[in-house]
Swiss-Prot record:
The gene is nrdR. It comes from Ruegeria pomeroyi (strain ATCC 700808 / DSM 15171 / DSS-3) (Silicibacter pomeroyi). A zinc finger (unnamed) spans 3-34. GO terms for molecular function: ATP binding; DNA binding; zinc ion binding. Its cofactor is Zn(2+). This is Transcriptional repressor NrdR.
């Protein structure tokens, strides 16, 4: 592993342990050339995934981008960060185990929405507002109305 401080290629692992999400390894490293210390994370990647955007453009799957968008939708929500990490890891595992290396962005969005709907309705609506490109308050209202079960008829 290259040292981020001086570029030296020969760094030493001083400590390895499972990370808090239990799907990656946290390694503390030391550079004998400059004395720098840094942390790396290692996780299993089953296959290289390519995202096919709605425009047809192809780009490498970026777990960090997925994580950022999910965390934005969950800002200021009472959700344990470890649960968020587990959800993200579950989504990535599901994508990697689909058997396809090319995955439409629409499919990724659907999988994320399924996961968010099980955890937090507000985060689900926030994510949907970006994913489904809401343009007006009516879009929110229609979407939320679809979430609610029909009210029983009132007797007058």
């Amino acid at each position: 592993m290259r040292c981020p401080f001086c570029g030296n290629i020969d760094t030493q692992v001083k400590d390895s342990r499972p990370a808090e999400d239990h799907v990656s390894i946290r390694r503390r490293r030391f550079c004998p050339a400059c004395g720098g210390r840094f942390t790396t994370y290692e996780r299993v990647q089953l296959r290289d995934l390519v995202v096919i955007k709605t425009s047809g453009k192809r780009e490498d799957f970026d777990r960090d981008k997925l994580e950022r968008s999910i965390r934005i939708s969950m800002q200021k929500r009472p959700i344990d960060p470890e649960r968020i990490d587990q959800m993200i890891s579950g989504i990535v595992r599901r994508l990697e185990s689909m058997g396809e290396t090319d995955i439409p962005s629409k499919k990724i969005g659907e999988i994320v929405m399924e996961a968010l709907a099980r955890i937090d309705t507000v985060a689900y609506v926030r994510f949907a507002s970006v994913y489904k490109n809401f343009q007006a308050a009516d879009d929110f209202e229609d979407f939320v109305h679809e979430l609610r079960p029909p009210s029983p008829p009132t007797e007058e």
